[in-house]
């Protein structure tokens, strides 16, 4: 899968073109298996939890690098019982992850086609009936839609091309996870 950017360009919008080119050549056209891992533990007080982003495997090659060792502290709004607003709420984090994933996909594609971005942002919104959440009942019908707006700017690029570029974000992994029904398997370990 070739990149149409000039061979003289080493970087587009902060993305190193030789590394991007090598990545696309390595993954080829076939299926690419990417295994991701996260571990979340309750912090023993209120709704505080800490998520640890672990190693990943790409095509069976496990990457255990310090660069993949991130921690996210979660909590809920201070207005909720037992909460101190010491970190983002889990649903807000999903919305933020969606925006970040759309930006990643759009920025990579922009670099791939040689578009130098000046601005790129995503605003994500969701409304839902929280009654099911508070009553601990089936909430599947309480979530109706997630909406997002992409703001994109690049000099010397037509509005049509920018619109096409912004639509690439719909193919990001988080968009796909949220927009299709997916099997969620659970295992309960009681100690």
Question: Residues of each region from the PLM?
Answer:
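Extended beta-strand/beta-hairpin segments
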Residues: 1-96, 106-191
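Alpha-helical metal-binding/catalytic segments enriched in His/Glu/Asp
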Residues: 98-102
């Amino acid at each position: 899968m070739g990149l149409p950017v000039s061979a003289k360009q080493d970087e587009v919008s902060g993305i190193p073109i030789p590394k991007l080119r090598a990545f696309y050549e390595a993954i080829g056209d076939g299926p690419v298996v990417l295994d991701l891992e996260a571990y979340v533990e309750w912090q023993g007080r209120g709704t505080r939890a800490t998520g640890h982003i672990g190693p990943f495997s790409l095509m069976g090659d496990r990457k255990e690098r310090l660069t993949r060792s991130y921690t996210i502290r979660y909590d809920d709004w201070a207005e909720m019982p037992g909460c101190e607003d010491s970190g983002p709420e889990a649903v807000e984090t999903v919305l933020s992850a969606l925006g970040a994933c759309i930006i990643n996909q759009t920025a990579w594609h922009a670099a791939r086609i040689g578009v130098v971005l000046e601005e790129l942002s995503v605003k994500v919104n969701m409304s839902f009936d929280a009654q099911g959440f508070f009553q601990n009942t089936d909430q599947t019908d309480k979530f109706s839609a997630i909406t997002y707006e992409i703001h994109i700017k690049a000099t010397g690029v037509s509005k049509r091309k920018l619109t096409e570029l912004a639509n690439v974000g719909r193919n990001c992994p988080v968009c796909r996870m949220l927009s299709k029904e997916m099997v969620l398997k659970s295992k309960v370990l009681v100690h």
